[in-house]
C-alpha cells in the first residue's frame, strides 16, 4: 500500500464495501479498499453463505 493522501479508505470488501469503492473511484475519488482475503466479496461470498450451499 503506497503512502499518501486518499479521498476514501474502505475497510472490507463485502457487498457494500466493494460497491462503495468502485463507485467512489468512478466519481473521481482517489480510493483504496483494504481487504484481508486475496479476493473481493467478503466472508459470505468467499467462504460463508454462497460456497456452503
UniProtKB/Swiss-Prot annotation:
Bilayer-crossing regions: none
Cofactor: how bound: Binds 1 FAD per subunit.
InterPro entries: Class-I_Pyr_Nuc-Dis_Oxidored (IPR050151), FAD/NAD-bd_sf (IPR036188), FAD/NAD-binding_dom (IPR023753), Pyr_OxRdtase_I_AS (IPR012999)
Enzyme Commission number, as recorded: 1.8.1.4
Source organism superkingdom: Eukaryota
Sorted UniProt keywords: Disulfide bond, FAD, Flavoprotein, Mitochondrion, NAD, Oxidoreductase, Redox-active center
SUPFAM superfamilies: FAD/NAD(P)-binding domain (SSF51905)
Annotated localization: Mitochondrion
GO cellular component: a single term: oxoglutarate dehydrogenase complex
Activity at various pH: Optimum pH is 7.5 for NADH -> NAD transhydrogenation, 6.5 for lipoamide reduction, 4.5 for NADPH -> NAD transhydrogenation, and 6.5 for NADH-ferricyanide reduction.
Regulation: Lipoamide reduction and the NADH -> NAD reaction are both completely inhibited by copper and cadmium ions.
Record bears the keyword Transmembrane: no
Keyword Mitochondrion attributed: yes
Enzyme class: oxidoreductase
Gene3D superfamilies from the UniProt entry: FAD/NAD(P)-binding domain
Function: Lipoamide dehydrogenase is a component of the glycine cleavage system as well as of the alpha-ketoacid dehydrogenase complexes. This enzyme has lipoamide dehydrogenase activity and NADH -> NAD transhydrogenation activity. Also displays some NADH-ferricyanide reductase and NADPH -> NAD transydrogenation activities.
Note: The active site is a redox-active disulfide bond.
Subunit structure: Homodimer.
PANTHER family noted in UniProt: DIHYDROLIPOYL DEHYDROGENASE, MITOCHONDRIAL, DISULFIDE OXIDOREDUCTASE
Protein name: Dihydrolipoyl dehydrogenase
